[in-house]
Amino acid sequence: MHLNTLAPAPGAKKSSKRVGRGMGSGLGKTGGRGHKGQKSRSGGSVKPGFEGGQMPIQRRLPKFGFTSRKSLVSDQVTLSEIAKVEGEVVSLETLKAAGLVKKEMLFVKVLKSGEISRAVTINGLKVTKGAREAIEAAGGKVEE
């Protein structure tokens, strides 16, 4: 096998028929477009979503919902993720340095998912009730 002998399998490539080249070609005269009407003309396509002047469905249906601006700067961290952070004190800066939250985050909440075995001090983060109990049971403390 050589690169210059490569060819598609017979019948795999269907050659296109030229349109409007006589009645004998099978696609003469109207060229497969039918008679008259907007779609038979050159450039005669309708844009997507156009329904002939009727109010389109994307405008008939109501808008709903919104994106909370606070969710763009808020994040959550689990106890199992905090257990991996080096150091005794865990704050927003240490979480950013460890790569657990993005730099643009302003608020972080600690959730009780997973376990923590060493004593850590949570500084300046919101903590759920279950996470607070787990941290204090491990010998750590929470400073708001």
Swiss-Prot record:
Residue ranges of the region described as Disordered: 1-59
Pfam families with a match to the protein in the record: Ribosomal_L27A
One cellular-component annotation, GO: cytosolic large ribosomal subunit
Bias kind Gly residues: ranges: 21-31
Keyword set, alphabetical order: Ribonucleoprotein, Ribosomal protein, RNA-binding, rRNA-binding
Example of a GO MF term: structural constituent of ribosome
Gene Ontology BP annotations: translation
Xref: InterPro entries: Ribosomal_uL15, Ribosomal_uL15/eL18, Ribosomal_uL15/eL18_sf, Ribosomal_uL15_bac-type
HAMAP family: Ribosomal_uL15
Subunit structure: Part of the 50S ribosomal subunit.
Main function: Binds to the 23S rRNA.
Family designation: Belongs to the universal ribosomal protein uL15 family.
Name recorded for this polypeptide: Large ribosomal subunit protein uL15
Gene: rplO
